[in-house]
A protein has these predicted regions:
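Conserved NTPase motor "head" modules and their coupling/switch loops across ABC/AAA+ ATPases, GTPases
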Residues: 7, 18-19, 23, 125-264, ...
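Hydrophobic positions in the central parallel beta-sheet of the AAA+
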Residues: 68, 263-266, 294
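Intracellular alpha-helical coupling/juxtamembrane segments of multi-pass membrane proteins
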Residues: 4, 107-110, 149
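Walker B catalytic acidic pair
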Residues: 268-270
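Nucleotide-state sensing region of NTPase/ATPase domains
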Residues: 2-84, 88-100, 154-162, 192-205
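Extended, Lys/Glu-rich alpha-helical coiled-coil stalks
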Residues: 92-135, 140, 155, 159
Length: 338
């Protein structure tokens, strides 16, 4: 976040790889947020990324450093917009499934063109036969997206249930799961691609009337379920937070298995709304990781057992930006940052 009255926020550091096959042992990473230009609500400015002094696109960051992040905004994952859950699943799929990002880009382009054509048909400025040109790439890419999403969810199932059982052992008998809800369900023996093609044909008239594509992975959803019940409708805030943290830990396990090394775990405001027992279980899980960063505005809000094993840094306002003070409490395994 850019400080009030400033034009730039910048963070830089060295990313070291423990992978012996890595082409570089360490990389210099520099990320800046610049006020003005293409502003985004999330960051307050446009991002500028440099790796070893060379400007890079944000998409290239994954090759340098993988990270799993939990922040206050993630609390919307359970009961918020389906778009948030789709994005979370898409980002994970793109990280572990070759070709997924390309299929997603192809689908997005075909969807935009098809929607434009549907509006033109509604206004009688185009012919319906023209839809076939965009139906093919939409169906091919859309079918691949659904198949890959289902594959990722299948890989997530075991680590998700295990992580939830570790954080909330009192609910060990109620398995946490993710259920994919599609508007183009496949019939017996039907592929996701064929199911999407069939549904597009069934909704053709309605789509022309609405001027938009009404079926496809861009309208699918992922539901959090505990013992088969939708968490969005019955769970407390603490239960929802526990489920989201379990998902983040499951992502960590999945990425670790895929890459051969664990990504960084970044946690912001992680302990609020958790009862003491669940806090303790989460601390034990965090403490077992090679490295994790935990941020808080008040050190007293953190679990004492976490502080005991952490290297603690403090960020204070300064005339020229921010001052980093520490480490004030070195430990054998760094796990917290203030």
């Amino acid at each position: 976040m850019i400080r009030w009255g400033a034009d730039v926020a910048r963070v830089a550091g060295e990313v070291a790889s423990s992978n012996p096959a890595a082409t570089e042992v360490a990389s210099q990473l520099d990320v800046a947020l610049v006020r003005g230009g293409s502003l985004t609500a999330a960051s307050g400015g446009r991002k500028q990324l440099r790796v070893n002094g060379v400007p890079r696109r944000a998409a290239a960051l994954g090759a340098v450093m993988r990270a799993v992040v939990f922040g206050p905004e993630d609390m919307l994952l359970v009961a918020g917009s389906p778009a948030l859950r789709r994005t979370t699943l898409d980002e994970l799929a793109a990280a572990i499934r070759p070709g997924y990002a390309a299929a997603l880009a192809t689908y997005s382009r075909a969807l935009a063109q098809r929607n434009r054509l549907l509006r033109a048909i509604r206004e009688e400025d185009a012919e319906r036969d023209e839809l076939r040109y965009w139906d093919k790439p939409l169906v091919e890419a859309g079918g691949e997206i659904v198949a890959e999403r289902l594959a990722v969810l299948a890989h997530l199932a075991e680590p998700l249930a295990q992580a939830h059982a570790e954080i909330a052992p009192e609910e060990a008998g109620a398995a946490l799961g993710l259920r994919y809800e599609t508007n183009a369900p496949a019939l017996p023996g039907e592929s996701p691609r064929d199911a999407l093609a069939r549904r597009l044909a069934e909704t053709a008239e309605k789509e022309v009337w609405n001027g938009a594509t009404l079926v496809g992975p861009h309208r699918d959803d992922v539901l959090f379920e505990l013992a088969g019940r939708d968490l969005a409708t019955f769970a407390s805030r603490g239960q929802q937070r526990t489920a989201i943290l379990a998902l983040k830990l499951a992502e960590l396990d999945l990425l670790s298995a895929h890459n051969g090394r664990p990504p960084l775990l970044l946690l912001d405001d992680v302990f609020s709304e958790l009862d003491p027992e669940r806090r303790g279980h989460l601390v034990r899980r965090i403490g077992a990781l090679p490295q994790a960063f935990v941020t808080t505005t008040a050190l007293g809000d953190l679990d004492p057992s976490l502080i005991a094993i952490a290297t603690t840094w403090e960020v204070r306002p300064a005339a020229d930006g921010a001052q980093l003070i520490g480490p004030s409490q070195p430990a054998t395994r760094p796990a917290a940052r203030r």
